[in-house]
Amino acid sequence: MNRRNFLKTTAAGAAVLPTFSILHAEEGVIGPADDQLNIAIIGYGAEGEILTDDCVKIPGIRIRALCDIWEVRRKMAKGRLRALGHNINIYEDYREMLDKEDKNIDAVVVATPDWMHAEHACYCLRKGKPVYCEKEMSNQLSRAREMVLAARETGLPLQIGHQRRSNPRYMHAINTVMRENRVLGRITHAYAQWNRSVAPFTTIKSSRLNIPIETLQKYGYENMEQFLNWRWFAKYGGGPMVDLGSHQIDLFFWVWDCAPIAVTAVGGNDYYNRQMNDNVMAIYQFKTKEGLINRAFYQVLTTSSRGGFYEQFMGEDGYLTLSEISARGNTAAPEPGKDWTRFTKMGILNESKAPVPLAVERSNDISLDSRVTKAAAGLPLPVELVKPAHMPHLENFFLAVRRKDAKLLNCDAELAYESAVAVLAANRSVAEGKTIYFKPEDFKVPADAKHDPAKAMGEQPKNA
């Protein structure tokens, strides 16, 4: 449940409290004491709740402390986690938590609004704590650079939450199907979308649930509306293009093993009249190490949920459709005349069992589109994720923490910085009305770059 669902826009705000989802006690797996990692959570909003729920299901993970500036959420987290056997302490201020719990914490999970990621992650790293930080690294590149520098300086694991990088189905599709066995041949184009209609701004009509205004202002928010809807304000987030697009644009880097050379994007605030773009359509051009030009189209819409979210990779020999929800995309299809029997015999793909959907409706309606022509036979991927989507990425992080080896991470700060550059550039392209061209060095933080604490602690961000 996210903040929007939790806080219905009714006068009886308190009445929604009992509807909060409850984990069964048997799901709160802790594991043997000699293999435990004690962790802290910073931020218990929608994403923080998801990550916390996944953490408690991983053997050997004990949550010892949690921080959120909203007292309602802190107390709710405390009640839930203590019921699952996690004797946690709760805090309003992350610095107080890290100072008091220093000897009790092995690692920290950060799930705060984007503008605070750098401040929280850098502070934790320099306190000697490995960090799992939700994407996007930041809504400002200067802050994302500080995260890279802090990880370099400390040598500690800093995992960025592009969880598809640890999803076994995505790993099989990209590494095994597309890259190692070249089932699709040369992949010339890619398409991805995340269409999700959004509700009006979340509000709270029961004033007793609000964060006191002095507390909000202490932590950089003018009012409760900004706090609840931070993704739509330039100071705090990058809008839907950054919030949603970062997951999928990262896949283009992974598939082609290179960074883009240009992005051209159009969009605007055409429906909701908010600070950040409510729709964006972007074309990325990639130049591979072999000198080949490939293109990818990405769109994010907030006025319609048509087709939901999925990715499609198109090659000379066939195409493959993916989605975190397998009903929306879990199949590859050959071009006419291509025989993929050898790939099914090798176990790379399963036998044909269903047509490939051009697009699939929202998750509660997975009926296929009607067609005039016969659908191509889809060969399903033989790998299915049977865990929550974020859990493998968290497990990968905890493995790196236990082994004290940041090289084990599937998405460290250096890698995530590359996609941050590309995603933030799309907003810039919209704002400036022009194509943004990249140089290879744009995607790397220079080896001789110097740490600037001010850039991680409160620099006023721009819409780029």
Model-derived segments and spans:
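Active-site beta-strand termini and strand-to-loop segments that position acidic
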Residues: 284-289, 315
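C-terminal helical cap and adjacent loop that interface with cofactors, partners, or active-site loops
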Residues: 10-13, 50, 224, 244-254, ...
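N-terminal Rossmann-like dinucleotide-binding module
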Residues: 13-84, 167, 252
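Predominantly a Rossmann-like dinucleotide-binding segment in NAD(P)-dependent oxidoreductases
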Residues: 43, 47, 153-159, 164-274, ...
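N-terminal secretory signal peptides and thylakoid transit peptides that target proteins
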Residues: 1-14
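A structured beta-alpha segment of the ubiquitous adenosine-cofactor-binding alpha/beta core
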Residues: 88-106, 110
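Beta-strand-loop-alpha-helix segment that lines the small-molecule cofactor/substrate pocket
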Residues: 113-114, 118-166
